[in-house]
Amino acid sequence: MAGSRTNDIKVYCSFCGKSQDDVKKIIAGNNVFICNECVALSQEIIKEELAEEVLADLTEVPKPKELLDVLNQYVVGQDRAKRALSVAVYNHYKRVSFTESRDDDDVDLQKSNILMIGPTGSGKTFLAQTLAKSLNVPFAIADATSLTEAGYVGEDVENILLKLIQAADYNVERAERGIIYVDEIDKIAKKGENVSITRDVSGEGVQQALLKIIEGTVASVPPQGGRKHPNQEMIQIDTKNILFIVGGAFDGIEEIVKQRLGEKVIGFGQNSRKIDDNASYMQEIISEDIQKFGLIPEFIGRLPVVAALEQLNTSDLIQILTEPRNALVKQYQALLSYDGVELAFDKEALEAIANKAIERKTGARGLRSIIEETMLDIMFEIPSQEDVTKVRITKAAVEGKSKPVLETA
């Protein structure tokens, strides 16, 4: 019932007392009525309270050890990177909380945005996702290779902010305290140390565009994205409290580190030392190396925290398959359990899966596709075979030389 007379009885709002003649619409409940004006007022009150809850949440930021404990539940290895991220994230949200209550004469704390360097499949994206989830803040992922500077065909950097606003259900106050992860940042590095006189649509220009929102600005974001709707009303969002994490593989940067350390490696004296492998060189990266790779100094300066991730080995990948709370083996065991079937992986099968991922150079992100390949036929047949009680995945099954072993009742 809404906004009309019933049996010539005039209806009044149970909250403000206005009659149906004084408002646009009245909604009827069980002996209760509410007008459209009270509905709108209620929505505003709820919105304000939710915004206050966001601010309140930030006053209870998990300590670095607590953040590390969460990361350890889901992410295998990368201990040094996890510690660096835990400290950086804690300091960032402590800064946000401090800024909300600071006086004008207090110390101005700068943002600690993060640069993650590591090979494909080493866990960069997953680390950022896990941190955002543990903090219950909006999270958005963007690919740097799809971005172009304003005026060129491609995606504007402002669209990254739109993704975050959408993740926050268009609650701008909540989005302003979210986390944005920009992947493939190494792909927009300048091609060489000399600045080209031609326009660099996908390189330095994009770095300059990203620089503005990373360091903190009030950006105008088109709610429908892109440049197709020039007359649309813009959303204003302040990026000063958004944590930006950027990541990339930076293939070949270890060679730059080797060149810089060359004199120390072959020379004599107290500064001389020997570094054994590329993984160790990754831990020696400094801003000078990143600049030589092709990121501009201003951009590097806005990313003071550098976390280097190492290539995952067979042992690491087996741990990823079996140990975390959301381990892939546990997920597939749960899937088959819904059909009343037990799933087991031989130790050799797990090693074969890990080795395949290493051969394909996909790291942890390639593990699921390998299991899917191995189990596709089984997952197709099992729901129709009610006598099957157990499936065992062998090394031969992973290598495609035989089918998984089935046990029946």
Curated annotation (Swiss-Prot):
One of its GO terms (molecular function) is ATP binding. ATP binds at P119, T120, G121, S122, G123, K124, T125, F126. Keywords: ATP-binding, Chaperone, Metal-binding, Nucleotide-binding, Zinc. SUPFAM superfamilies: Glucocorticoid receptor-like (DNA-binding domain) (SSF57716), P-loop containing nucleoside triphosphate hydrolases (SSF52540). GO terms for cellular component: HslUV protease complex. InterPro entries: AAA+_ATPase, ATP-dep_Clp_protease_ClpX, ATPase_AAA_core, Clp_ATPase_C, Clp_protease_ATP-bd_su_ClpX, ClpX_bact, P-loop_NTPase, Znf_CppX_C4. It holds the Pfam family ClpB_D2-small. Residues 1-54 form the ClpX-type ZB domain. GO terms for biological process: cell division; proteolysis involved in protein catabolic process. The keyword Transit peptide does not apply. The keyword Chaperone applies. Zn(2+) binds at C13, C16, C35, C38. Component of the ClpX-ClpP complex. Forms a hexameric ring that, in the presence of ATP, binds to fourteen ClpP subunits assembled into a disk-like structure with a central cavity, resembling the structure of eukaryotic proteasomes. Belongs to the ClpX chaperone family. ATP-dependent specificity component of the Clp protease. It directs the protease to specific substrates. Can perform chaperone functions in the absence of ClpP. PANTHER family: ATP-DEPENDENT CLP PROTEASE ATP-BINDING SUBUNIT CLPX-LIKE, MITOCHONDRIAL (PTHR48102:SF7), ATP-DEPENDENT CLP PROTEASE ATP-BINDING SUBUNIT CLPX-LIKE, MITOCHONDRIAL-RELATED (PTHR48102). This is ATP-dependent Clp protease ATP-binding subunit ClpX.
